[in-house]
Amino acid sequence: MQMAGRGANRRGQHRSPVLVRPPDAEWSMRTFGVEEELLIVDPVTGEPLALADALLAGQDEPTSGLSHELKLEQIETQTRPCHSYGELLQQIRRGRAMANQAARQHGARVAAIATSPLASNTHTTPDPRYAAMLDRFGIIATEQLTCGFHVHTSVESPEEGVVVLDHIRDKLAVLTALTANSPYWRGLPTGFDSYRTQAWNRWPTSGPSSVFGSLTAYRRIVKRLLETGVIMDEGMIYFDARISRNHPTVEVRVADVCLRAEDAALMAVLVRALVETASLEMLDGVEPTAVPTALLRMASWQASNSGLRGDLLDFGDFLPQPAADVVWALVDYLSPVLDDQGELELVKAGISDVLDRGNGAHEQRETAVRYNKRQHDGQTQPGSPPTNEALAAVVGHAAKVTVRGAAADAHKDPAPMLTRVRRP
């Protein structure tokens, strides 16, 4: 099956690839699933609440679809493997509804925001590994109350997984900009759209990785990193994208948790298209672009800083271009696969909505501005920092949007199991 590209973007720096599947290949859409980290918050003050133990009491974590994370102020949801945007969206909403139902039983709510707008002390989940991380990494672990969004996409083998990692590494910063949802940090405006990215990149292995070239090389690098003694175990391989240790998947880890469930499902569709495009490029003999890792770090920093507000570094030449142009260039690059999978129009509509509305960081800032104007009869000093009350309003708004569209009965479907994420 041949999928014709749509041609070059306006500067001709990157084209939608012309990809050819082997004519005898059996093909079906890759399954995908996601993990979302959510804040547990006070619905009045907006402050994080250390209630994860209470929310998870009596639940079988491996099968419930809810689990602990590093901090007691957060809870993680996991979807089942899915085949379509609609199926995944239903699962994401279900996970959010389950978490929120558990939180409501203790007078709390969950909010899909990637950092806490309000300052508070954090509490590490009682667990020997987490205790060792706290002792080893100090303030990095102490302050690590951040909520990310991880997308797992099925691959045929670890070898294919490494090919995917090498091909997608230069495009991941665009996802950071689209999902950026953390403009505040411990009571302060940061000037960043995704400050979670900055906080997360303090870990020793975090951020973009180099081109590996083979599974042997990937495993050699992981082995060398472990031999340094700096990190505790393979679970601390925090590359922007990695081969999952537990599932037959590639795991992409650059995104903030998305405020809206629809945006989360949309980002997962983009990731799946990246994975499929990478695999087809391999079959066509297309080599990964050897962009220096230093440039990828710069692109990640820029996406984290300005989000969709200004320029991003274009993934063709890594020069600054308007963010919307770079986002549409990514859609254009992925369009053959998206079209083949019947998702192109869905993605175009979803991306248009995000660009028109703004990412989560923009929505958080706008909520704070609206609150201040209401409290001061429309008279506010430009650039004045938001009050704690305004930040509480940000959290309250986020908590409402987080569960918008969630099913009334969050326990109807079978329990999520990401271990089943694979091609049928």
From Swiss-Prot:
- Please state the Enzyme Commission number of this protein: 6.3.2.2
Sorted alphabetically, the keyword list is: ATP-binding, Ligase, Nucleotide-binding
Catalytic reaction(s) noted = L-cysteine + L-glutamate + ATP = gamma-L-glutamyl-L-cysteine + ADP + phosphate + H(+)
Q: Read off the Gene3D superfamilies from this record.
A: 3.30.590.20
MF annotations from Gene Ontology:
ATP binding; glutamate-cysteine ligase activity
| Biological process according to GO | modified amino acid biosynthetic process
Q: Where is this region: Disordered?
A: 1-20, 405-424
Q: Kindly report, in one word, the top-level EC class recorded for this enzyme.
A: ligase
Task: Give the similarity note.
Answer: Belongs to the glutamate--cysteine ligase type 2 family. YbdK subfamily.
What this chain does, per the entry, is described as:
ATP-dependent carboxylate-amine ligase which exhibits weak glutamate--cysteine ligase activity.
Q: What is this protein called?
A: Putative glutamate--cysteine ligase 2-3
**Which species is listed as the source?**
Paenarthrobacter aurescens (strain TC1)
